[in-house]
């Protein structure tokens, strides 16, 4: 709702009183659709939908997969009567997920809300319960007869009334269906101390918020053909990575290789089968699959009998497999090349059969009797390979985004849970074996170790190592990350991030580049600079990710609608038939693809087929592909159809629909009319007005950029005569075949780039820089920052919404939680203190609170328990009985060891006092006396900080031990060296601050807050920075927000006109006067408000110097780092400079005296540091040489002494001789 004022007048007469319900919509109206989308979906729907799918369906599927454990106990036949065989069976049924709970140390279980989990460092997780049935069967074992088991006992587990058994805890994603916040109203959220702007989509593990980053991978089950580079004997290869739809992420790869380079004779084709050592000629595989005659094999590969080129290419292959003419021999041929050696022929044949059934193209099926399907699929792969080899088709593009999948929380957790559940069932089975062998009673409580699943999931989410703890090295790292809470937009952006797990140091540029197919799905600007550039991406605003639906209904539908099954397909009888694929499996062929496609589309638009399913008809290749799998990135588009009344293509969405959407929105905001039927995004989807398109389907449609592009060309021609200079120039379209239309082109941007005003007027890397810096800007990250105890938080005192806004900010809540202030900026050279990206700031504005911020840091500690009796205690340590106390003052602590809120603290003051008891027999490095009974374990404030204690939280952790968090607050005032940035990648630090009387002023007496240097503009081409300033000036004068959205009709000309109307120079220049002399400045100064952000790099957090201080234990050199009061490293390059200068004494002083000078005595005879020196008696002796006189004292770095001694330990003897000892 851009303009409530305009819509109000409609509401007075009639809610639907728009001009004409069937009138075409304008670009403005599409924002109503976008609002509807975000009102229903939110910005993290991809995370939530994925997790909900996991809990609702996947979890149960995994349990059903290994649902039954069977243990047979055969009769031992030790005595006559011992002829009874037993069979024990445990089966898992339905799984139940509770609401999040916590088990306290005293045994009480109660509901756990997210805020409590954050404050007490708990895990926000639900219990998993499963129905377990136990059955026992018996049979009388008569030799030579099959066992006939009779059920003798069946029991459900009765520890709870319903027979549910606890198997572990599942961390719950906030705002998902299982979370308490999902149905909470705004007032409930305030009661729970949650911020209504918090969007969920993350987990709370041990009190810290964790996001699962979407992991990008290549899609399975698709055939791809690649050319091989010259040295390889293989010219082309077709490969498919088969992954089972459901079930383990078990992947088997099949490669079909074309040997021989172009022009060489005998170019045979061979395939690499799993578990088979050599490549097998394809004809042999066909024969092993039961397709014997040559003609039939060729027909499986080449669908056109008259295609002599392809048949010619297949000639060598037929000759290659000529020796083998029946199925048995072919299977034996494959079996011989297997991994199992020295087995009989029958076994070998069975082995080959098993491989072809289970390992060869397992995604088609793993059952037997589907040889013909697999043969056709293999033929299809060879066909694709030959098409590429004959240059009729290009090789596949590895970086095509439609051939990629993103694994979100659902698939990631499923993969992990499957592994853990397998481990759990294995443990249960072992326990069953033990109880049966030792004839104990079977106790379900002991059998199920619930910790397996609980700690397995918690470990993966806490560390980000995705996989089992034992295999930490092989698993992926960084899958789960701590949620970035620096500013609201950085949080949103983090929840929409994707990662490509390729080695970061790979020199390959291709995977990092922006690909055409990323359009509208991935933000083109927001990616990190440096080693992860292009590998870490962010989703565009309207992107969603499919959660995966069951393909069975579609397959059934296809069969009913005239798809001939693959088994009955005879290529030469129907040469024009279209191949039908569902999720990469070739199911059959169809004679009338156009009509089938039409039907499928209609069904999808009605909602009978899930809207996220994608359907692609490739007319040239005669293929129809349908994808229902999870992880495809898709986005919504308007549907364009032929309009009979108008006689040209027109959007299906009309003004009437927009009116209904706006009425519903008005209803939500104002509580408007009673009789408004709810009309939401789903209504648009179900009425077939918009549809979801993924990257693969996008290849087969034609998209118009704006609704206006659909107007027929004739209509525009008469308007071309009087061109308004203030209008943007439109591209003229002569296409009439549009099938879809963009909802709005600015939706190609992601979260961070949507905040930039006029990004379409900037050089592209500048938008990338701002996307990174916008995440470091201070603002208000959430409205409940006062009740949260984050490790660090920065809050701007007076955040303002920007004067130049973009329409997308409405959905990013940037007006509600902004991160910056509108500073009055002059672009001028003044005094020279703003060179090289520094700027001059007005000290008087700073004194009034410009860019001031609060900084919070929390310190956490808990009483740990060692063994049964020894526990740490919070108290004020006393010097008399406590060892190893810190240097800081303990005076500010109360007697309970905690500091009171409101106390001013400075560096190294102790803020949490804690002691550990020492056992009486322990020896403490000679400091210990009889009185000392405790050791200090207190927490001091960071040495470089100071502030005021803001809040102290005392509670207990899950084990019932005392647990405290102390939050310290500091005010950070802008000073020289602090970093600021506009929203265009124009960052700079303060070079100097002048009071207002020293600043230049305009004729109206306005003084700028900031002066930036004009040299920052031309080479960087951030024109938008200037346009923003101009627009903000108009906005400030007129009192409206300026719309700086990209790809709109706003032009500099138009803004200048408005500024002129307000009585200012149209291009934003003003006459200014020198603040020191009062004289007019020679030049006109570009002057106006611009939105600036305060970034988190502040000089007070970086300043560092040291004279003497702590040394490392091993090398006795200064320690490293500001936090440890470390030294400044004089490194190799600095050393080289000093050598080049010839400054030898300075070099020695830096590298030795100022670091680790050390004195040793060496023996003049053996040259070793073996001298025993009694300095107070002035006696020296080298025992080995019996030498008391020829002894030298030398000064060398301690690190050098250490090196010599380490070399001695390796049996290398460095001997040190002085000039004098050589003369001796």
Swiss-Prot record:
Q: Where is this region: Fork loop 1?
A: 467-478
Gene3D superfamilies membership: 2.40.50.150, 3.90.1070.20, 3.90.1100.10, DNA-directed RNA polymerase, subunit 2, domain 6, RNA polymerase alpha subunit dimerisation domain, RNA polymerase Rpb2, domain 2
Q: Where does the record say this protein resides?
A: Nucleus
**Domain of life assignment:** Eukaryota
Give the EC number(s) listed in the UniProt record.
2.7.7.6
Principal subcellular localisation of the protein? nucleus
Q: Which InterPro entries match?
A: DNA-dir_RNA_pol_su2 (IPR015712), DNA-dir_RNAP_su2_dom (IPR007120), DNA-dir_RNAP_su2_hyb_sf (IPR037033), RNA_pol_bsu_CS (IPR007121), RNA_pol_bsu_protrusion (IPR007644), RNA_pol_Rpb2_2 (IPR007642), RNA_pol_Rpb2_2_sf (IPR037034), RNA_pol_Rpb2_3 (IPR007645)
Quick one: which residues bind Mg(2+)?
837
Residues reported in the UniProt entry to bind Zn(2+): 1163, 1166, 1182, 1185
Is Ion transport found in the keyword set? no
* GO molecular function (one): ribonucleoside binding
For the biological process aspect of GO, one term held by this record is: RNA-templated transcription
The family classification in the record reads: Belongs to the RNA polymerase beta chain family.
Any further remark recorded for this protein:
The binding of ribonucleoside triphosphate to the RNA polymerase II transcribing complex probably involves a two-step mechanism. The initial binding seems to occur at the entry (E) site and involves a magnesium ion coordinated by three conserved aspartate residues of the two largest RNA Pol II subunits.
Q: What quaternary structure, including any partners, is listed in this protein's UniProt entry? A: Component of the RNA polymerase II (Pol II) complex consisting of 12 subunits.
| Role of this protein | DNA-dependent RNA polymerase catalyzes the transcription of DNA into RNA using the four ribonucleoside triphosphates as substrates. Second largest component of RNA polymerases II which synthesizes mRNA precursors and many functional non-coding RNAs. Proposed to contribute to the polymerase catalytic activity and forms the polymerase active center together with the largest subunit. Pol II is the central component of the basal RNA polymerase II transcription machinery.
Record-given protein name? DNA-directed RNA polymerase II subunit RPB2
